[in-house]
């Protein structure tokens, strides 16, 4: 918790939002809570023809005739603690990002910051960088303010608990689970009202993005349960629900708003996503037309993702294709992404104090490229970690016969993703067909074809495989086709 004198000193330079109804929603196993939402319902008091005067209503109460909402997106103010040129800053820059492996997290910042000073725990005064929106019932932003704040969270929820509250609002059921952790006795009604309204606003924001051409491909996240020795005992999957979408949409709104607020002509850190590979997309479309109902949407989604460009950090704004945004940045996770910390510092210079950036565009671009490289290395490490634990898991299932689908085709065989565990392994070309047969790789049609009898194995085909062997040191799984497969 922050010392009283630090709060007393900081509140003079910040917007005091400790009375705003505020909560966090995070994964159940999260240890740091670096973003929060606040919600208040405002009423239109009068209009003078030039603008509106807003009158704050009772905390969290239901609005009457003309609902107008104040929604705050509050991000832990890491830049207050991590100053440029310090050892902590240098180490964070070298890492570029936190790395999330199956059995551990390698944090970008020290634990004292992640899990204490910058963790927005309920009932504690915390320093934030915030984007505070005034929105109408159609999710239109009437005005916004980017500012440094002091907040005090009322509730800490995980995604399942938040979803329970949302569903209770939709079905009229009694709220079954709640985690006050410092919330007041009137918090239940306020929380239900806040989540109900925010969920409606988020759905409208999401619908607008999709209408503008945003990609909406969603994939379940593979998770492992480990025993006390770190051995996987279960593989399970987490699917995005309305609570995930709620948080996602308001984080996207904050990121986009900050990027637009900076304007053009000043060096800035954008998150950009170029157009996809047109030739690859045409191949995907042709494949879909040819296969018709024989190909699943999951396979088409997989190919569409593979055709996309990689999102990167850059001072050159080309927009974000996947989100259908003309301006976009990363502002909402400075505790785990160094570019967000750079953005917070630039916001302080440009918007809060009106000072110029101390770095040239070339220097800032070098930092962007470094952070993009760190991100890609971290993503590869995370993929490798998942593959390792898949191999450990499948090593306990040698000899089992299991159903799956072809998830990738190459000149040396094809990959199969098992239907239940979704572990992926290789059926090598030497284990396909009969001795003497020649298998040819048809790259455009994503298949292997036998030259002698034209039998083929195509991306997305259902197959039954036998777990042949696992190389844990190399994180590799080998399958062979089951007899009569």
Task: Show the residue positions of the predicted features.
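Short, structured beta-strand/loop micro-motifs enriched in basic residues and often containing a Trp
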Residues: 441-450
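Electropositive polyanion-binding surfaces
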Residues: 2-435, 440, 460-485
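C-terminal structured domains
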Residues: 452-454, 458
């Amino acid at each position: 918790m922050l010392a009283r004198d630090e709060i007393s000193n900081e509140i003079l330079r910040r917007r005091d939002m400790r009375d705003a109804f505020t909560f966090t929603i995070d994964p159940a196993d999260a240890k740091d809570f670096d973003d929060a939402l606040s919600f208040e319902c405002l009423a239109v008091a009068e209009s003078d023809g030039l603008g509106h005067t807003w009158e704050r209503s009772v905390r969290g109460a239901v609005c009457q005739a003309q609902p107008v909402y104040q929604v705050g997106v509050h991000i832990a103010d890491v830049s207050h603690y991590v100053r440029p040129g310090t050892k902590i800053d240098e180490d964070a820059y070298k890492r570029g990002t936190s790395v999330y492996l199956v059995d551990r997290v390698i944090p970008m910042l020290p634990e004292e910051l992640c899990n204490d000073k910058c963790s927005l725990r309920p009932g504690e005064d915390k320093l934030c960088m915030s984007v505070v929106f005034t929105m109408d019932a159609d999710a239109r932003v009437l005005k916004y303010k980017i500012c440094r704040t002091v907040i005090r969270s009322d509730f800490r929820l995980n995604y399942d608990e938040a979803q329970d509250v949302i569903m209770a609002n939709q079905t009229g059921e009694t709220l079954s689970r709640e985690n006050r952790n410092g919330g007041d006795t009137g918090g239940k009604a306020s929380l239900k009202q806040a989540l109900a309204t925010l969920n409606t606003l988020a759905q409208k924001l999401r619908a607008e993005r999709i209408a503008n051409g945003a990609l909406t491909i969603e994939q379940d996240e593979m998770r492992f349960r480990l025993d006390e020795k770190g051995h996987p005992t279960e593989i399970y999957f987490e699917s995005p629900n309305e609570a995930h979408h709620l948080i996602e949409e308001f984080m996207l709104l904050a990121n986009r708003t900050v990027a637009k607020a900076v304007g053009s002509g000043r060096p800035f850190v954008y998150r950009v996503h170029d157009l996809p590979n047109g030739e690859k997309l045409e191949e995907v479309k042709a494949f879909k037309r040819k296969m018709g109902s024989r190909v699943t949407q999951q396979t088409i989604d997989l190919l569409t993702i593979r055709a996309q460009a990689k999102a990167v950090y850059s001072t050159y704004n080309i927009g974000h294709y996947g989100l259908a945004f003309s301006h976009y940045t990363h502002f909402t996770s400075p505790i785990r992404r160094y570019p967000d910390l750079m953005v917070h510092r630039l916001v302080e210079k440009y918007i809060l104090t009106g000072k110029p950036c101390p770095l040239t565009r070339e220097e800032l671009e070098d930092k962007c490229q470094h952070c993009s490289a760190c991100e890609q290395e971290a993503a590869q490490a995370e993929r490798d970690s998942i593959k390792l634990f898949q191999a450990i898991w499948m090593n306990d299932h040698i000899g089992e016969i299991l159903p799956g689908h072809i998830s990738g085709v190459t000149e040396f065989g094809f990959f199969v993703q098992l239907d239940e565990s979704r572990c992926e392994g290789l059926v090598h070309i030497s284990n396909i067909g009969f001795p003497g047969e020649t298998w040819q790789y048809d790259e455009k049609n994503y298949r292997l074809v036998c030259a002698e009898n034209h039998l083929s194995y195509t991306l997305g085909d259902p197959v039954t495989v036998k777990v042949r062997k696992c190389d844990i040191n190399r994180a590799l799984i080998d399958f062979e086709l089951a007899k009569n497969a």
